Amino acid sequence: MHDIDFIKNNPELFDEAMQNRNFGKIAHKIIELSANKKHTLTQLYSLQKERNNITQEIEKLKKDNIQCDTQIELSKEITKKINHINNMIKTDSELIDLLNILPNIPDKKVPIGKDENDNIEIRRYGKKVDFKFPPKTHYELGENLNLMDFKQAAKLSGSRFVILKSQLAQLDRALANFMLDVHTQEFGYSEISHPVLVHESAMYGVGQLPKFADDSFKTTDNFRLIPTSEVALTNLVSNANINANELPIRLTACSQCFRSEAGSAGKDVRGMMRQHQFNKVELVSIVTEEQSELELERMTQVAEEILKKLELPYRVMMLCTGDLGFSASITYDIEVWIPSQNQYREISSCSNCKAFQARRMNAKYHTISNGNKVNKFVHTLNGSALAIGRTIIAILENYQNQDGSITIPHVLRKYMNNQDIIKKQ
C-alpha cells in the first residue's frame, strides 16, 4: 500500500517509479480520487452534524409539546441525502482497489530494466565441478536410484508433485534441520511453527491478494494455503505497535508451501524445479526504517552462508525494476549452479519491502522524540534460506558421481546417520 500524501507531494516521481515497473502514469487519478473521497466525506460529516442538531431540536420541541412536523420532514430529507452519499462511497472503494494493484516503489539502487535479462550480477562464489562425464539431471539421478517417484505422485495428485523415498526423504528432512540450526544458532533467528492455512486478510497483508489470487490455492471459508512462510511470519505483527527497542525481530520457519503455478505452462515440466507443493525455510525481519537497508545485506549473507556450507557454486543478482516482486522495493536473487542445464537457477530471493506491507497490515513501531511518542510503520524483509526442493536438485547434480551415486555434503552427514553417500540399494 502506498502513502497518498507522498503521491500528492511527488506525483512525477511516483509516475516515474510506476513506469519503471511497467505501469502507466497513475498519480493524477489517485490524487483526483483522493480529493473526491475527501469532498464526499466532508459532505457526509456536515449532513450528519446537521441531522444530529435537528434531532436534538425535535426532542426538545416534543418535550415542550410544540409542533415539529417541519423539522421531522427536514430530518427525513437529510437522511435521504446521507443514504445517497453512503451509496456514493464507492469512490473510496475505487481508490483502494487502485492502490491495491500498484506495486512497491523501487529503491534508488535498483537498476531500471524490463525483465530478468536486465538484472545485474553482484558477485559469484564457488567453483563449478569439472565433470569427466556428461552430468545427469536430478530427476534422472533420483529415478535411477529408485528414490524419486513422479508417476506415483501423479496418481495421487496429478502433475508437479513428487514422492521422495528413503535417503532422499531423509535428505529433505536433514536440509530443513541443518538450515534452521544455522539460522537459530549462528544468526539469532527465532524459530516459529505456524499454520499453513491462513485467512485471506493475511494474504492481503503481504501483497499476495488481490492481485495474485490465481497463484494460490483457496480452500473453504476464505482460507488460503500459504505460498511461503513469509505470509504467516510477517502477519505476526499485523495491527501491532512495537517499541523500537524491541527491533529488529528476526524469525525463521520451515513449512510446506503451495503454489498453483498459474502462467507456468510449459516451464520446468519435468522434475522438482517447479512444484505445486514444496518445503522451504524462510527468514523474516521486522525492523525500523533506519535498520532496513543493512538488514537486507545481512539477510542475503545468511542465505548465502547455507550454500557456502554446502559448497555449492552460486551467484547473487540484483533484480531490475521490471523483475521485482510486487511488494519488494529491492531484491537480491541467489542463483545456484545446475550442471545439467548449464546455468544458474534461483534458489533464494531476499527482499526489503520497506513500509509497503506494513501499511497493508497496519504494523507500526513507536519511539520517543522530544518527549513525544512518534509512531512509524515498520519495515519488513523476507528471504528464502533456502527452498529445500531446489537445494536437493543442486546437491544431486553437483555431487553426482559417474556411477549415479550421490556424495552427501559434509555438513549434512551428522543429520543423516553419518552416511557419506546415497546409492542404489
Swiss-Prot record:
Pfam families: Seryl_tRNA_N (PF02403), tRNA-synt_2b (PF00587). ATP binds at residues 259-261, 346-349. It is an enzyme of class 6 (ligase). It catalyses: tRNA(Ser) + L-serine + ATP = L-seryl-tRNA(Ser) + AMP + diphosphate + H(+); tRNA(Sec) + L-serine + ATP = L-seryl-tRNA(Sec) + AMP + diphosphate + H(+). The keyword Ligase applies. It is found in: Cytoplasm. InterPro entries: aa-tRNA-synt_IIb (IPR002314), aa-tRNA-synth_II (IPR006195), aa-tRNA-synth_II/BPL/LPL (IPR045864), Ser-tRNA-ligase_type_1 (IPR002317), Ser-tRNA-synth_1_N (IPR015866), SerRS_1_N_sf (IPR042103), SerRS_core (IPR033729), tRNA-bd_arm (IPR010978). L-serine binds at residues 228-230, 282, 384. PROSITE patterns: AA_TRNA_LIGASE_II. GO terms for biological process: selenocysteine biosynthetic process; seryl-tRNA aminoacylation. The keyword Ribosomal protein does not apply. GO terms for cellular component: cytoplasm. Its EC number is 6.1.1.11. Keywords: Aminoacyl-tRNA synthetase, ATP-binding, Cytoplasm, Ligase, Nucleotide-binding, Protein biosynthesis. GO terms for molecular function: ATP binding; serine-tRNA ligase activity. Homodimer. The tRNA molecule binds across the dimer. Catalyzes the attachment of serine to tRNA(Ser). Is also able to aminoacylate tRNA(Sec) with serine, to form the misacylated tRNA L-seryl-tRNA(Sec), which will be further converted into selenocysteinyl-tRNA(Sec). Belongs to the class-II aminoacyl-tRNA synthetase family. Type-1 seryl-tRNA synthetase subfamily. This is Serine--tRNA ligase. It comes from Ehrlichia ruminantium (strain Gardel). The gene is serS.
